[in-house]
């Protein structure tokens, strides 16, 4: 209740300030983006270097001990750069610590074992649900001033012989004949209100882990490297702030292979990255159902710019685990182009997850082609249209978007009997090659504005 009251007071203060300044000059949301950008300051580190090969025991087939020991010593001595030199190295999960820049040299290939025996238990969140699970390939909890940099490659080695085996994806047959996998078990634990400390998935039944999971961390820099073959989401900052993800290449087409998913994070910059993924390229999240309401922390002040998206379920998505809300997102100067890219912008939730999504600004997007729609809303995601926690999407702006090929422009799937999405503005957009221009589904949405919009060369006034 106190948190909600504080949010209302902050909103009133913002409104009062805005009203008092109306006579002077209208504040552009893109000027606000500049202010947020100025608050996102990349991490800096002392000029100290620790090379992992100096800590390696030749008896070890894995470099895990060498890497983690170098990280610990570096952190204890005040920080610096832990260098993984040119060459190929095999490791188990790595634990990042404060004031450490884990640096991959230009010709480094860092491979991660797929043997669950080497994966310790850590606190994390899987698809918005809190639990204890086997460690992500790179993990940090409560650390400050951390980085992964360099032009090397990190390979999770996930394929159908390990993380994507039939048993892990489809599940195994239980004694009662029911076929279930570990992720579904976690869903059931959440539905049964089992406390998160009892939602434990050990080595023998661990849920596929994220590649990089940075939990409750501050001042994060991820720059330059390539990620391949992840078991699950690739980059997952969680309950963290002041994050820069720059010039990272994400190439991974496995199940649930989202590219970058900031969850309940504040002040995030994602720029000049390449996405070629098996799920959403970027998906902004803030918890799911009861767990999301317990934390009640939105994702806010997120900037995406100068990125390139190929395959994926969406170029930029918000949700579906967005119970804590999402506000103040800017996406600009991106290119998105693939027959296997489903949607350009996608916002999704349902009546059990809820969440308020507001102040979303998109401009200067070049689309070669996408499989379905330019803008998609799903307020009944997973066909859940009945529940006490209605999502609410509003103040969404699209400007200067061009597309050469899509099935349709809009697919705004709201509730049949209520309005839970409004104030959508589409301006200065050109949509060509629209195969079904008259099948723009708009349900449960009001106050949609079109200005200088053409579809297949014809002026488009509305739906």
Write out the residue ranges for each language-model feature.
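Alpha-helix capping and helix-loop boundary segments enriched in small/acidic/polar residues
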Residues: 58-61, 257, 261, 265, ...
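Structured C-terminal portions of repeat-based eukaryotic scaffold domains
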Residues: 374-379, 391-398
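Active-site-proximal loop/turn and secondary-structure-junction residues that shape catalytic pockets
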Residues: 88, 239, 286-288, 320-322, ...
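Right-handed parallel beta-helix
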Residues: 106-107, 144-152, 218-228, 241-252, ...
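Extracellular "leader-to-stem" segments immediately downstream of a signal peptide or signal-anchor
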Residues: 2-7, 11, 20-83, 88-101, ...
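Short, T/G/N/S-enriched strand-turn elements that build extracellular solenoid repeat scaffolds
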Residues: 71-74, 90-98, 224, 233-239, ...
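Short glycine/acidic-rich loop motifs that flank beta-strands on beta-rich extracellular proteins
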Residues: 79, 90-93, 113-114, 134-135, ...
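Active-site capping/gating regions of soluble enzymes
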Residues: 343-348, 358-360, 373, 389
